[in-house]
Every structure is written in C-alpha cells, then in structure tokens.
Amino acid sequence: MEHIFLELRSPGPDLFQLGPFSLRWYGLLIAISVLVGLNLSSELASKKGLKKSLINDLLPILVLASVIGARIYYVAFEWRNYTGKNFWSSINFLNLNIPLPSALEIWGGGIAIHGALIMGTLSIIFFCRWRKEPFWDVIDVLVPSVALGQAIGRWGNFFNNEAFGIPTNLPWKLFIPYRFRPEIFSTQDYFHPTFLYESVWNIFVFGILIFLFRKSNKKELKLPPGSLSCLYLITYSLGRFWIEGLRTDPLCLGGVPPFCEGGLRIAQLISLFLISAGLLGIWRIYVSKKALPDPSSINGRNQ
C-alpha cells in the first residue's frame, strides 16, 4: 500500500524573491533559531540567578563564532569542492555579477554543527573569562536552546534538498529531485529524511534537558554545574552517531564518497569523542564528587 499522503517533498530553498533579493528558508530558520534561543536562554539564565544582560551580551559573539566555525569546519572537509575551477563563484546584485569565493556562499547550505559547537564553546570561554562569569552555569542555561535550535535549523536541510539518507520506501519517505541525488542512487526517487530524524531527536534531547532544569530550579533535583552540558553531549551525540550512518553525504576523513569507504565518517568519530567526554564529566561530578574544571578560569578552578 502506498502512503503518498506522507511523502515529503521540498518546495525549494527560496521563501520568496523580490527583484534581485530573495529570502531563503535556510536563513529564516537560522534567524528563528537565534530568536527562540535568545528568549529561552534569557529566561533560564534569570531563573539560574545569572545577570539578566548576560545572554544579550553573549549572543552576538556566540552566533558569529558558531556560524564561522560551522562553515570553516564544513569547507575544511569538503575542500576539494572549493578549489580549482570551483574556487570562484558570483552573486547577482542589481544585475551585476560580483565575484565571490565559493567557500563564502553560506546561504546555499554547507555548515556543520560540530564546527559550530567547537567555535561556539571557545567564544563562551572567552566571554566568561572576560566577564568573570561561571562557565558551566552559563553553558548549562544555553544547551537546551542549542538542542531546540538544532531541531528548527535541521529543516533548512529539507528545503535545500541536502543531508538526506539512503534510499527507502518507508511511509515517511523523502523525495529528492534528480539533480541532488548521488550518482550511485540516480535511479532512486525516495530517501530517508535524516533531517527529520535529527530534528525529532533534538526535540527529545531538549525535552530531557528542560525537564531536568525545571526540576533543579524547583529544588527537587540537585544538578551540579556542568551536568546538563555533559548530558547534552551524550544524548545528542548518541542520536547523531546513528543518523550519520544513514546519510549519503557524510564529511569523510579519507575514503571514497558517498560512504567514506576506506575512511572514517567525521561526525561519527566526533560523536564518539563527545559521548566519552560527557560520560567522563558525569563520572567526575557524580562518582568522584568533584567539580568540573572551569576552562574560562586561568587556574582551571570554578570562579
């Protein structure tokens, strides 16, 4: 039996176009993620007893660092697609073709969450050292927003017809136009909607984090600083490891695309590292009964 009514099909990357200007779904979803994250993190920070202005002051630095990190990370592992004849591209502005390095065309897609996490974390360390804020308290109020923002942002992959999985005929199958399919699957029409899997998984992660935060805020549960951050690393990375195994466009360390034959899937490797880091953090907090070292403090101790 065909379940055509459940078929997913992207309407395209552009929400609307006005003359030379266009609004892309990808950019809109990122903007929505930022706004939702700002409001949620500000509310959680206030309940945590942090300064009300903290999130507003941190957000511009965090967003800029995260976007830059996400793009650099992606381009670094896909460098072959941005060299030689592919190095230059152009944008049309008022009927003028302006040359631009293709690596800067972030609006066309091609960002990686792990790059955003790395640069975003570094920016928080810098900010907390500068403002003398407690690093783990700050990052604990941010991770629920990160999970929710990822759930929203993943839909940008849907509109761009990217980051999809291997062929499938499941009821929730995703139709991919011919020009976006890997050559090996050129005759296949339907694929796993891995963007949807990750979006749903991130909502699940968000639910766990916000539930525990509220329990802690009501004094019904004791959560030492860093607990939510470690839990985020573990839960998000578990889902990402599985979902990455379905994708046809993984970033590879060596190997042959689209399945990194003879090489490694970078996201799975990073996920294993993050799971290990999260478990070590939980062990230190709850078994060794020691506070996590504060990376924003010069001596590594909590401020």
Swiss-Prot record:
It is an enzyme of class 2 (transferase). Its EC number is 2.5.1.145. It comes from the Bacteria. A 1,2-diacyl-sn-glycero-3-phospho-(1'-sn-glycerol) binds at R154. One of its GO terms (molecular function) is phosphatidylglycerol-prolipoprotein diacylglyceryl transferase activity. InterPro entries: Lgt (IPR001640). It is a multi-pass membrane protein. Pfam families: LGT. The chain crosses the membrane at residues 18-38, 58-78, 106-126, 133-153, 193-213, 223-243, 266-286. It is found in: Cell inner membrane. One of its GO terms (cellular component) is plasma membrane. One of its GO terms (biological process) is lipoprotein biosynthetic process. HAMAP family: Lgt. Belongs to the Lgt family. PANTHER family: PHOSPHATIDYLGLYCEROL--PROLIPOPROTEIN DIACYLGLYCERYL TRANSFERASE, PROLIPOPROTEIN DIACYLGLYCERYL TRANSFERASE. Catalyzes the transfer of the diacylglyceryl group from phosphatidylglycerol to the sulfhydryl group of the N-terminal cysteine of a prolipoprotein, the first step in the formation of mature lipoproteins. This is Phosphatidylglycerol--prolipoprotein diacylglyceryl transferase. It comes from Prochlorococcus marinus (strain NATL1A).
